[in-house]
C-alpha cells in the first residue's frame, strides 16, 4: 500500500505555526461541542468525513484551506478570512517599503549634495 506523500512545506512549519494550527483546531472542536454537535453531524454539515474533521480539530496542517473555511463559516467566523493576508497588515512588506523610502531619500540627498557641489565648483 502506498503511503501519502507529505508536502515538504508541512514538515518545515515553524513550531509557533504548528501550535497556532493546533489551537485553531481545538477552538473549532470547542465551538462544535458548545453547539452540542456530534463529530458525525458536524462532518456531514461540513461535507467531509469524520476522520477529516478529527484531523482538522487536531490541528493537522494537511487539512485543506477550504475545509478550514467551511468550519469557520459554520461558526460565523469566516468574515475574518479576508483580512488574514490583507496588505495593510503585512508588517514585513510595510517595513520593506519604509526601508526603500529611506534609502530613496538618502540617494536623493546624495544626488542633491553632489549637484550643489558641482554648481559651486563651476562658479569658482
Predicted regions mapped to residue ranges:
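N-terminal flexible/basic segments that precede or flank functional cores
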Residues: 1-20, 84, 88-124
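Short basic helix-loop element that most often maps to the first helix and adjoining turn
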Residues: 26-42, 104-106
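Short alpha-helical DNA-recognition segment
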Residues: 36-54
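Short acidic/histidine-centered micro-motifs embedded in hydrophobic/aromatic stretches
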Residues: 45, 71, 84-88
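Short, basic-rich loop-to-helix N-cap that marks the start of a DNA-contacting helix
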Residues: 60-74
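Short, charged/polar surface micro-motifs in flexible loops or helix N-caps
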Residues: 77-80
Amino acid at each position: 500500500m502506498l503511503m501519502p506523500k507529505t508536502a515538504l512545506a508541512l514538515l518545515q512549519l515553524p513550531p509557533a505555526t504548528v501550535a497556532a494550527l493546533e489551537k485553531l483546531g481545538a477552538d473549532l472542536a470547542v465551538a462544535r461541542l458548545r453547539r452540542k454537535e456530534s463529530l458525525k453531524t458536524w462532518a456531514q454539515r461540513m461535507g467531509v468525513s469524520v476522520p477529516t474533521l478529527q484531523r482538522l480539530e487536531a490541528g493537522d496542517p494537511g487539512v485543506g484551506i477550504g475545509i478550514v473555511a467551511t468550519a469557520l463559516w459554520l461558526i460565523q467566523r469566516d468574515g475574518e478570512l479576508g483580512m488574514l493576508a490583507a496588505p495593510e497588515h503585512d508588517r514585513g512588506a510595510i517595513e520593506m517599503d519604509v526601508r526603500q523610502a529611506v534609502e530613496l531619500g538618502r540617494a536623493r540627498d546624495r544626488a542633491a549634495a553632489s549637484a550643489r557641489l558641482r554648481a559651486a565648483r563651476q562658479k569658482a
